[in-house]
Curated annotation (Swiss-Prot):
InterPro entries linked: PyrdxlP-dep_Trfase, PyrdxlP-dep_Trfase_major, SelA-like, SelA_trans, SelA_trans_N_dom
Record's keyword annotation contains Chloroplast: no
Modified residues (N6-(pyridoxal phosphate)lysine): 293
Keywords: Cytoplasm, Protein biosynthesis, Pyridoxal phosphate, Selenium, Transferase
Family, similarity comment: Belongs to the SelA family.
Biological role: Converts seryl-tRNA(Sec) to selenocysteinyl-tRNA(Sec) required for selenoprotein biosynthesis.
SUPFAM superfamilies the record matches: PLP-dependent transferases
Gene: selA
GO molecular function terms listed in the Swiss-Prot or TrEMBL record: L-seryl-tRNA(Sec) selenium transferase activity
Protein name: L-seryl-tRNA(Sec) selenium transferase
Catalytic activities: L-seryl-tRNA(Sec) + selenophosphate + H(+) = L-selenocysteinyl-tRNA(Sec) + phosphate
UniProt pathway: Aminoacyl-tRNA biosynthesis; selenocysteinyl-tRNA(Sec) biosynthesis; selenocysteinyl-tRNA(Sec) from L-seryl-tRNA(Sec) (bacterial route): step 1/1
This protein's GO CC annotations: cytoplasm
Length: 466
């Protein structure tokens, strides 16, 4: 008998209790559609002479397989993972983790109407920047501030507003490319201004900027080269000197800090990073930086500077296209509040807390985790406690690395390193590490709660070579 003729009808399957449970959870249309696809798959497999399919063609396990497929279909594509790569602000893994206060503020804004653009005192329309502007100005020393959806957008809005159709002078050594082949010259072109590059890759002097000024010059721009470093025979123009030259010529100095920082990181024992406050103090007329990198907040781009320039940017129609919503503003406001006190910021903001985590603490965690991980591997791979180096990530301080510790997995001949990495990614809560010098490495700097990691070790599916 042709096994395809024994497949049950959809009506018959739908009368079973298991199907009714699936319908209650997933909806009738989803269940019926999945059953049709599943039965069609079985018919086609049986028609090709697939023996296993023939044995299953009588309909055994159809509803179980349907339940599995529906569960997989319903699983969110965007999932939590454990970031054990050693890169604290990993762009591909979502960058900064929000503080609890920021996350709670975002949640409150999500589930309620808010005074996003409503002045409660006057009973009139308000400005959404009002919820964060005073905080940004207090932390940077700027006269005014506005927020858009990321730092590239902030740079684009700034240039489009202040230099449309005109030249912006930039040092050749600062024409950076950030992730995804996104280059400063491309942003400038899209903003509608013309790049006038000066100096050389490794050395640019104040006279290079002075000689570049002409009637078409709209601004000087300085871009912090946060994702690479040039060492050796180098020279760059100090911000204060460039600001003074800009003032003499009646043009603004614009600074893109990229990752940016509101705190002096060297006070925490971290590599120093330019701060927005110092840029404003040195005479910058407008400064842009990210909210989800060293700031440790939600993704956004912050522009701080003179009242006159920021007001012009707010009046640009692009501002509406690039504006942030109430969720971002709620999270950003709480993050900025935390930055009001450096020690509070380090305690509350995960990015700062993780970056300043002592190596001894991380090594102690590695020593606790090594025995249960070794047991879960069943001898298929070697695991040991290793010292390693973490990095800040998201283009910040690429040369300066942070002493850390973790678990290193070496091949024994039974299982290749690539399969070990895959096994950890396949866990219910995927664990993302990195391969370094032939070993799979889990840098434990970002693992503050080991319980979820340990709870799923029994699900670690390793096998020998296929």
């Amino acid at each position: 008998m042709d096994p395809r003729s024994t497949l049950p009808s959809i009506d018959r399957l739908l009368r079973q209790a298991e199907a009714r449970e699936l319908i209650a959870h997933h909806g009738r249309d989803n269940v019926v559609g999945m059953l049709r696809r599943l039965l069609q798959d079985r018919r086609m497999a049986a028609g090709r002479g697939d023996r296993a399919a023939g044995e299953r063609a009588a309909g055994e396990g159809v509803l179980d397989e349907c339940a599995e497929r529906l569960a997989a279909q319903a699983r969110p594509s965007l999932r939590p993972v454990l970031n054990l790569t050693g890169t604290v602000n990993h762009t591909n893994l979502g960058r900064a983790l929000l503080s609890r206060r920021a996350a709670e503020a975002a949640f409150r804004a999500m589930i309620s109407a808010t005074n996003l653009e409503y002045d409660l005192e006057r009973g009139t329309r308000g400005d959404r920047d009002s919820h964060v502007e005073a905080l940004i100005c207090r932390l940077t020393g700027a006269e005014a501030a506005t927020v858009v959806n990321n730092n590239a957008a902030a740079v684009m809005l700034m240039l489009n507003t202040l230099a449309l159709g005109r030249e912006v002078v930039v040092s050749r050594g600062e024409l950076v490319e950030i992730g995804g082949a996104f280059r400063v010259p491309d942003v400038m072109a899209r903003a509608g201004c013309r790049l006038h590059e000066v100096g050389t890759t490794n050395r640019t002097h104040l006279r290079d900027f002075a000689n570049a000024v002409n009637e078409d010059t709209a601004a000087f721009m300085k871009v912090h080269a946060s994702n690479y470093a040039i060492e050796g025979f180098t020279a760059e123009v100090p911000q204060a000197d460039l600001a003074a030259l800009a003032r003499r010529h009646g043009i603004p100095l614009l600074i893109d800090l990229g990752s940016g920082s509101l705190l002096d990181l060297d006070a925490f024992g971290l590599p120093p990073e330019p701060t927005a406050r110092q840029a404003i103090r040195d005479g910058a007329d407008a400064v842009t930086f990210s909210g989800d990198k060293l700031l440790g907040g939600p993704q956004c781009g912050i522009i701080a500077g003179s009242r006159a320039l920021v007001d012009r940017m707010r009046a640009n129609p692009l501002k509406r296209a690039l504006r942030v919503d109430k969720i971002i503003l709620a999270a950003l406001a709480e993050t900025l509040q935390s930055h009001g006190d450096p020690e509070r910021a380090r305690a509350e903001i995960p990015t700062l807390r993780l970056l300043t985590r002592p190596q001894d603490e991380i090594r102690a965690l590695a020593e606790r985790l090594c025995p249960p991980v070794h047991a879960a591997l069943s001898g298929l791979a070697e695991v040991r406690v290793v010292d390693c180096l973490s990095q800040i990530g998201s283009g910040a301080q690429p040369v300066d690395l942070l002493p850390s510790a973790g678990l290193g997995f070496a091949e024994t001949g039974a299982v290749p390193v690539s399969r070990i990495a895959q096994a950890f990614r396949d866990l219910p809560l995927p664990v993302i590490g990195r391969v370094h010098k032939g070993e799979f490495l889990l840098d434990l700097r970002c693992l503050e709660d080991e319980t979820p990691f340990l709870a799923q070790l029994d699900r670690l599916a390793l096998a020998g070579p296929a």
